[in-house]
Each structure stands twice: as structure tokens, then as C-alpha cells.
Amino acid sequence: VDSLARALGASDLLADTGAAVRRFPMAITPYYASLIRRFDESDPIFAMAVPHGGEVVDPPFLSDDPLEEEHDSPVPNLVHRYRDRALLLVPSTCAMYCRHCTRKRVAGQQESAITDAELAVAVGYLRDHPEIHDVILSGGDPLTLPTERLEQILQAVRAVETIDVIRIGSRTPVTMPMRITHRLVTMLRRYSPIWINTHFNHPVELTPESMEACGRIVDAGMPLGNQSVLLHGVNDDAQVLEKLFRGLVRNRVRPYYLFQCDLVRGVERFRTPLSKGIEIMEYLRGRVSGIAIPTFVVDAPGGGGKIPLLPNYIVSMSPTHTVLRNFEGRMVSYPEPMERHDSTPAAAPHAGVATVFELCRGTATTLGPDDHGGCTAHGGGARRAACEVSDTTPGSPGAVSRRREPSRWSGYGTEDWSGLRPARRVSRPRALRGGAGGV
């Protein structure tokens, strides 16, 4: 903190940040610090990078791990929440520690990276779960690893035949663009298909250096997306985000997600009402090309996963017509087909999981919160000791309750892990490492 204050020529800059720094580490690259123009919270770069006394003030509904990633971690360094994808946390460090990070509990708390033994365990889990086709490397920031070490990790993951796509979540193109070298992207290209999601939050970050880094990634054949976070006082302004998204698309970066700030300790000052994000989405629709509009999502607390939030454009529905509202507020009537073809639901769920599909089919009359979600043999399998599924068919005397045990795993290559069985929490040699990244 003192070094930053001296570098910026603002010795009295951080009078109230001591407690915040003691709780959450601080790091900022000289490049990113050079983007600061005002030494207070009104500057977006300052707000995202410099500790603030508000980081030690927490309402009771905030937590260290609001997404319950550790509950969905069957082996160290790996999070398996969604059936077909997994998150692999490879380093615990970043070039710059964002003050709004969802993994503040671990990011930068210890400078470490996944070991060979831990990587072998994670890869073993991927091999034993062929339903996983998509692996996201996150952390920390994977692109802060030495190129040789990153290649070893990519090589190990790519060796799993059922993995179709590898994704990398990285803020390095934003905070340390000089790291995106020809040598790095040439190495990454060898493990194609690789998709990269970066993390621009404000137009000020769209510098010639960062755009050159993004261009180098795209020119190497890797699709590049962006995951922004809606931050009070930084980008909770429709015109600011319009400028950001237009600038990204102009430089071949596709806005992918706009995240509601997570319910993590230390970030209350950044949180906005959900209505603010919906308001911004309403503003963008019709003003900005569809390829420049991300999906606004809230990552549900308790490990509920991402929930998209959109303005409601349906005014009313009847068997013959649906009344819709367009981006101008004009209402139109859309005629439904003369013959209905919706007697069969569009898709069946995974076997043994009660969902809305059962209600549509008529094989169940009710669906409660304990009847689905996190109880299957894939993502969330360790979330409950057992799951109750209510199965009521028309004409039956009542609901038949059946108990399903969660999936079991054992070992995956190390003696310390061989005796473990599923539980709500999986004890492990050291804390799950973290950083910013989305699934």
C-alpha cells in the first residue's frame, strides 16, 4: 500500500485501508496503476484495485464462499457443479487482486499453484466422469503461471479423451497485457480448441496495450469472450456499459456475461440492486447490436448456479394469441399456431431427477425444493447426504418417497484420499485456491 501511495504521489491516500489490507491481500501491476487518474473512489481503476475500509464491514447475509464451491469440490482444486463441465483451479495468485473478487477468501492468501500430485488427482476425476466435456481453468489467474507449467496442465487435461473444450478465465489481458506474448499464444494454440474469457469492467481498461493483447489471442484462433461484473460506482451506468461493450466487439471480444456482484464478504460497497442490471439490459436492447449484449446473470447463493435475468417482454398469453412488448414499449399481438404441437415436453431430464418435465408429462403433481438440484450423480453430488424425490403419478394413492444416495468416489491416486467418501464438506490438505472465473 505504501509503495502504491509513493508511486502515485499520494502519501495520504490510504488512511482507512489498513484493516482491509490485513484481511484481503493487495497487488496491482505498474501498468494497471498507471491507468488511475483520480486518487479516490470516483476513479473506476482506483475503486477496483485499491483497498477500502468498507471491505471489513459485512452484512450478515454475506459469506466467504457464497457459491459453495467447496461443497461442490469432490477432489482438491476441482469444482463440479454442472453435469458437463468442471472448474479446475490451478494457481491461487493473480497479477492484480480485484477488490470485488468472488474468491477473496483464498485469492492471494497463499502464493501457490496446483502440484503434480493434485493435478493427477483432478485428471483422474475427469477420466472417471466422461460426462464432463468442458474444463475451465481458473484460480487465481492461469495466465500468470510460467508458460511451461501452464502447458503441462493443458497437456494433462487435453489427454482426457472425453474433454472437448478447454476454457481459460483470465484478467491478465486487462491488468498485465504484456504477458500475452507470441510465445504464449503459440503454445495455447497447440491445445485447441481453447476458448478464453477475460474480464473488462470499464471502457478505461480498453487501452491500446490491452486491445493488442486481445488481438494476439484472437489472431491465434482462440475465441475471446468477456465477463464483466456490475459494480456500484464503477460501471452501474447504462451508457458506460454501452461504451464498454461496443469497444469490446470492435476489437473482436464478445460480451458473454454481466454478473451481479456475488454475496461475498468484503464487497458490499460494490453491490447493486438486481433491478439495476435489468434496467441496463432494457436500455441496451434495441440500441446495441445483439452480439454486443451479454447475458445478465446472478450466481445464486448456496451453489444454485447461474440464473439469467432479463426484462419481461411478455405482456399476456392466451391459447390463440400472445401479447408482446418490444424495446420501444410498443405492444404487438402474436398469433399462436392453429394446431397445437406441444403435447410432448421439449426435453427429458437426467434419469432419476424430478423436474418440471414430470409436471408437464403428468407423472407428478407437485415439485418441492428437495426434489431436484444438487442431488444427482454429477455436479453437486456431495451437496447432501441423501436426497428425497417425491414421485406422484395420477391415480396413485399418494406420493412415494424414495431415497437416493449421492455418487461415491474414492481415492483418485493418492493414499491420503483413498478412504474418503462423500460428505457435505470434503476435508483436504489445504484450502481450495481461488480467483475470478465463471463456468
Model-based region annotation:
Residues 25-28, 72-103:
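N-terminal pre-triad scaffold of radical SAM enzymes
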Residues 111, 115-118, 129:
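Intrinsically disordered, low-complexity linker/loop segments enriched in Gly/Pro
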